[in-house]
């Protein structure tokens, strides 16, 4: 006999949809028919518009179903935005996995002398990021579709920031770190926000292996801001 959860999973598999499955010690198995790191979404659209202050600027954001943190800018992204320090090396900034755009747009607004690239695999999120850039009159940006960094292999960056898709799995996140190192200029920096319970210690260890260094820049409410600098 199958459990009720097993029958639900079998029914979903028969639909042919992409599935994201996460296992948590407290919450058990969670089955999601779509997630924010999916390229396309069949979830019905239900756009919402709201205001949010970041780095002293009030932004108007439009969000939708099937995008990350649609009701407000999540705490981890806010902490990353507030903790980030402009690198000493000149060059562009990359918001890796931009979603509807809060990280990239807020940094572009403040660092007007820098060009900010914003990439994501989720087509709905990219459309929202473009709308939010226009609505907030942010012009020093380029928004592209990219699965990790595969769509911007021709670019090098002074800084890369990411709130990585933890539920996509550790291997995906660590691959993002590896690709980010290759995409950085010498003395460029990778900034990552990740919760302790979702793997901050192992993420720091991976960054140390890749870069030879990794620093905890901030810790609040279980969220870690990690920075690694490329020296060669």
Residues covered by each model-derived region:
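SAM-dependent Rossmann-like transferase core, predominantly class I methyltransferases
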Residues: 40-89
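Class I S-adenosylmethionine-dependent transferase superfamily signal
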Residues: 107, 179-181, 207
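Conserved class I S-adenosyl-L-methionine
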Residues: 195-212
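N-terminal auxiliary segments of SAM/dcSAM-dependent transferases
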Residues: 9-55, 66
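A short glycine-rich, Lys/Arg-flanked "PGG" loop and its adjoining helix->strand segment in the class I
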Residues: 174-186
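Core SAM-dependent methyltransferase catalytic element
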Residues: 219-232
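Conserved beta-strand signature within the Rossmann-like core of class I S-adenosyl-L-methionine
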Residues: 187-194
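Conserved SAM/SAH cofactor-binding pocket of Class I
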Residues: 76-162
């Amino acid at each position: 006999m199958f459990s009720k959860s097993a029958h639900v999973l079998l029914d979903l598999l028969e639909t042919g949809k992409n599935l994201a499955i996460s296992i948590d010690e407290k919450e058990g198995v969670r089955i999601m028919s779509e997630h924010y790191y999916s390229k396309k979404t069949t979830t019905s659209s239900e756009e919402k518009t709201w205001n949010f202050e970041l780095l002293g600027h009030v932004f108007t954001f439009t969000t939708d179903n099937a995008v990350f943190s649609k009701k407000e800018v999540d705490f981890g992204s806010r902490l990353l935005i507030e903790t980030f320090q402009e690198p000493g090396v000149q060059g562009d900034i990359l918001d890796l996995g931009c979603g509807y755009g809060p990280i990239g747009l807020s940094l572009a607004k403040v660092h007007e002398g820098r060009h900010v690239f914003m990439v994501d695999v989720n087509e709905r999120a990219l459309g929202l990021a473009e709308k939010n850039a226009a609505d907030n009159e942010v012009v020093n940006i380029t928004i592209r579709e990219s699965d990790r960094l595969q769509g911007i292999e021709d670019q090098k960056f002074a800084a890369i920031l990411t709130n990585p898709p933890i539920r996509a799995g550790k291997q995906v996140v660590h691959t993002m770190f590896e690709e980010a190192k290759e995409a950085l200029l010498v003395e460029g920096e990778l900034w990552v926000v990740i919760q302790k319970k979702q793997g901050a210690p192992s993420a720091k260890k991976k960054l140390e292996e890749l870069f030879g260094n990794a620093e905890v820049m901030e810790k609040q409410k279980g969220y870690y801001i990690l920075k690694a600098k490329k020296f060669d």
